[in-house]
């Protein structure tokens, strides 16, 4: 999703200062506890290992702070499959597109590789950020974050419901 500050302002009507305080309070609990309450999508870590073994270059581009992305990826078995873990940088005010660009920059993609790159995302912000970077985005509903029709309306190249469907789509 979008940066937390933006969400608190848009969804809760908070001022910039109020949103900053809400983020501080949120992270006060999330950083030591909530980060470990996530659940991975069934089968996704295994597919990531398989894709990596087959030569795919995998990266994470998240609006979460990068140090938290690293914790989550390590906890759920994704870190060894990812060549790059890119998250938001403190105080940088990064958009989703900024984080995607950061991941692609760190990967050092050639123009040919960029043409074969696809974003996989669970919210409209992922689809929109990918489009801003010139990438197609496959929407995934198996995380349960997107509302009904959200990914299609945002322009996802395809929408899948399971990790197996994602694998099947990527191989087609």
Regions of interest found by a model, annotated:
Residues 36, 79-83, 110, 157:
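Conserved H-loop
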Residues 96-127:
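Conserved Lys-Pro-Asp/Glu-containing loop-to-beta segment of HAD-superfamily phosphomonoesterases
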Residues 1-45, 52-54, 67:
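N-terminal helical cap/lid subdomain that shapes the substrate entry/recognition surface
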